[in-house]
From Swiss-Prot:
GO terms for molecular function: toxin activity. It comes from the Eukaryota. Disulfide bonds join 2-16, 3-12, 8-15. This is Conotoxin ar3e. Expressed by the venom duct. GO terms for cellular component: extracellular region. Keywords: Disulfide bond, Secreted, Toxin.
């Protein structure tokens, strides 16, 4: 999902 791709350990709403 986008969180993994963005390298962000938080929710997609926060990261993306």
């Amino acid at each position: 999902d986008c969180c993994i791709i963005a390298g962000c350990p938080f929710g997609c709403t926060i990261c993306c």
